[in-house]
UniProtKB/Swiss-Prot annotation:
UniProt binding sites for FMN: 67-69, 97, 126, 188, 218, 263-265, 284-285
NCBIfam families, sorted: IPP_isom_2
Subunit: Homooctamer. Dimer of tetramers.
Organism: Moorella thermoacetica (strain ATCC 39073 / JCM 9320)
PANTHER family registered for this protein in UniProt: ISOPENTENYL-DIPHOSPHATE DELTA-ISOMERASE
Name of the protein this chain belongs to: Isopentenyl-diphosphate delta-isomerase
Subcellular locations according to the entry: Cytoplasm
Underlying gene: fni
A GO term for molecular function: FMN binding
Top class in the EC scheme: isomerase
Swiss-Prot/TrEMBL cofactor(s): FMN; NADPH; Mg(2+)
A GO cellular component entry from the record: cytoplasm
Amino acid sequence: MNEREYIGRGRRKLEHLRFFQEDSKGSNGLEDVHLVHQALPELNWSDIDLTCRWLGKTLAAPFIINALTGGPPETLAINAALARVARRTGIALAVGSQRAGLENKEWRESFTIVRRENANGLILANIGAGNSPADAGEAVAMIAADGLQVHLNAAQELIMPEGDRAFRGWLENIRGMVNTLGVPVIAKEVGFGLSRETALQLYQAGVRIMDVGGRGGTNFAAIEERRRGRSVAALAGWGLSTAVSILEIRELGLPVEVVATGGIRSALDAARALALGAKIVGAAGYFLKILLEQGEDALTEEILQWQEDLKRICLLTGCTTPAELATKPVVITGQTRAWLEGRQRH
């Protein structure tokens, strides 16, 4: 990569950071998922345990600060703060795409800082599916990661004028990562959701953890329109919502873990996703906005509030753990129900 391309990649990352703060408030479909209140839960507050084991480590709650940024020097302080917040709240953290750090050694510190600030935490590396297994291994080693997010961002690339246009071979790259890396590989969409067809392809390639990255959160079509003043209205509503994506995977009945991301903005959203069958729930843009506008302490307090709210929801649905939410009744209405009914016919 030449100097001009370095500058272009860095500028794009910083522009995305700025626009991430402008929450699109799109529908993630989880408003269609209704938990059933139990007036006689027969539980005490002390009975509720939010801790969970994931990727060999114990989390204080089934939450992750999802992939955001890294690369240009301006991102170092952001990643350092996110790592400290994850450590203080006992939840997982994923870095943004490490492609920039692989290509420019001067930018690696913006990624390695997370392990220095959170030495024992659960941290995920991140790289695109267009990269080789060797590059993926380097990304994992860079931050001593507990797992690798391999992001599937074809729609995002097509929206960006400077984005990639070659996507053949991605599945083989993923298969190679699964077979050669010594850590779990998590296939991750970045805002357009996962269909059952894609989930089956990933499963056949050996992937056992899928991050749905559903529609309803960061809207790259809207971001690109603001970045470039270039309309991409045809893709403005493209993709599968977070709720639909979780259900698409669940309908396959495969032994996979689902990470629910895409427009998660509250503990209630998280509880709804867990009730649909997710194991872990994450947010990216929502957390970033709080960090940049209110500071590190405010983000820490917000996540701790989510944990307390999730504990309340567990008690009021008769659950002693978040995992039990998946065994409780839910009512699905609206567009999500319409999607499920339509999919059964086609």
